[in-house]
Amino acid sequence: MRVLIAAGGTAGHINPALAIAGALKKADPTAEIHFAGRKEGMEYRLVTQAGYPFHHIEITGFQRKLSLHNIKRNIVTLWNLALSGPKAKAIMKEVQPDLVIGCGGYVSGPVVRCAAKMGIHTALHEQNAFPGVTNKLLAPDVDIVFAAVPAAVEKLGAPQKTIVVGNPVRPEVFTQAKNRDAIRAQLGAGDRTVILSFGGSLGARRVNEVVGDLCAWEQHEHKSVLHLHATGQYGVQLFKDLEQQKGFAEGDSLVVKEYINNMPELLAAADLVISRAGALTLAELEAVGR
């Protein structure tokens, strides 16, 4: 069996796609799993790190706010959209998949639509209660739709072929939960309280601001903590500015990264998790009992 998965934009689309890929490989070790996405997107790094073949297709969303910059970006988007159909068809010819799965993000659009037109079996997975635009447009044309929660079924517009299955969680989230003590030892946590905070792969300004206040308090009050924080892509400079403004710094008690690549390990080690209520985040927190 050969499967092509299209997902992109944020970790909330990419990580469930990787979880699906892992489940397919477990069910059929001979299965070939391929991914389609943007090389400039987060999906390229996460998918190639996981060891799956990656096929590039350039597609972006439209900017809704009116400005000269956004007009230029929308012209580029129109150009990429025009090229995305032929590119998706070329990927189909190269991979020759038996099944194409869309897990959200703009990149799913041309890939899944092309597969459906070519008579290839197609499926969607929707992680959220409020489906994204791409999945809502694709749902009527695919063979089957998987929804994480019942609230999404009617909103997807294809209730007769939608099944509620929950959100897939990466196997390593469960396996690493058993290694809590060893992971804490590797982190040098000792008896300290381990706090893990993040606001999503792109970052959340308000989360970064609140965590900045917390980090300042922890250091000024000399609290016995090990705080691990991910700023997200758009929060890197903001958090550096907060360090200067509020008088705290990275060091033995605070580790700051743009993105956490070893989230299953850190979830296992954490005593407290501070995060946005993203669908996949909630699923993984529930899996480890945090």
Language model segments and positions:
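Conserved nucleotide-sugar phosphate-binding/catalytic loop shared by glycosyltransferases and other
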Residues: 3-10, 30-83, 165, 233-234
